[in-house]
Amino acid sequence: MSLKETVSNPYSKWLEATGPENDVIISSRVRLARNLMGYPFPHVLGHENADKVLYAVQSAVAQKSLQEAVGNLELSRMTELSSIERQILVEKHLISPDMLEQPEKRGVVLRDDEVISIMVNEEDHLRIQCLLPGLQLKECWDLANTVDDGLEQIIDYAFAKEQGYLTSCPTNIGTGLRASVMLHLPALVMTRQINAVLTTLSKLGLTVRGLYGEGTQATGNLFQVSNQVTLGLTEEEIIDNLITVALQLVTQERAARRALHKEQLHQIEDKVWRAYGLLKYARTMTSNETMTLLSDMRLGVDLGVITGIPPGIIMELIILSRPAFLSKVKGADLNPYQRDIFRATLIRERLNSLSNE
């Protein structure tokens, strides 16, 4: 898939609703922060040096040995994309919101299936990311590590024997690894257990964020849980610790769902079918309303209240209904009211198409 196809297609591998524990865990991500020796960190990187870093990365990912190990990788400069197309990459979780600033200094490397992405000149020179559906942290780590090893054979990393990999943010020094899982936790929210859960996670040294990471709220009952510190821990320890916590959250969420199904079945059915009805027939719909209703419908699908709707379609609708993607599909900039109308139209069409498939 070319970059232009990537920003025109709501599909992404991590949206498939496959993989272990996929009824609760939407996706797993491993990200490695790396910097090139001999260059300032990106926040003080001039345009000339930024170009040199981009060129070095472009040359490295084109090497036959790396391509044979992990598949076809291609670097694109952010200036090759419109502002809307850059925002779509954020909406698909392929780049961070910070990448929208100073596009002339930045680039992104993508594999065709979007499982691998590398942000160039974001907070660090390289942010190697692997993103897979369900609970697949070990698989993400193995793939990200393969990319990292391949690049390290070509590029000199900034590394110190005592500290490990040197990074722009002190919390990333050491392994430079940030692992995270995205979870759908509607039952813990509905049973008002979520605050206690979040408090426990914080005490365990984990960070909880919303759908789009730092600074975002947990809309649609979607929560990102990640490690905070990398220094003093091995990569395997970080991954294993997060897997243990993720499985505990899966157990708690499923228990809460069973309790709701047993004790409040009529209320749950009403909530789910109301959400489905609004999504299928409403003529305007805000972004936040869409996220709430899609969460309710996904819960209904997972509980067996609604049948015939693949969970992956619900995840696809989350991306399809985001502001930049709406403008891309429409082929024009839309004001908020126009977006609400077009969002409702696209959702209706997609849900109605399921009955014809």
From Swiss-Prot:
Upper lineage: Bacteria, Bacillati, Bacillota, Clostridia, Eubacteriales
Extent of motif RDXXRA motif of the pArg binding pocket involved in allosteric regulation: 339-344
Entry keyword set: Allosteric enzyme, ATP-binding, Kinase, Nucleotide-binding, Transferase
Known regulation of activity: Appears to be allosterically activated by the binding of pArg-containing polypeptides to the pArg-binding pocket localized in the C-terminal domain of McsB.
Domain Phosphagen kinase C-terminal: residue ranges: 24-256
Transmembrane segments: none
Family: Belongs to the ATP:guanido phosphotransferase family.
Alphabetical GO biological process terms: phosphocreatine biosynthetic process
Binding locations of ATP: 27-31, 93, 127, 178-182, 209-214
Gene3D superfamilies in alphabetical order: Glutamine synthetase/guanido kinase, catalytic domain
Entries under InterPro entries matching the protein: Arg_Kinase, ATP-guanido_PTrfase, ATP-guanido_PTrfase_AS, ATP-guanido_PTrfase_cat, Gln_synth/guanido_kin_cat_dom
Entries under Pfam families matching the protein: ATP-gua_Ptrans
GO CC, any one term: extracellular space
Protein name from the UniProt record: Protein-arginine kinase
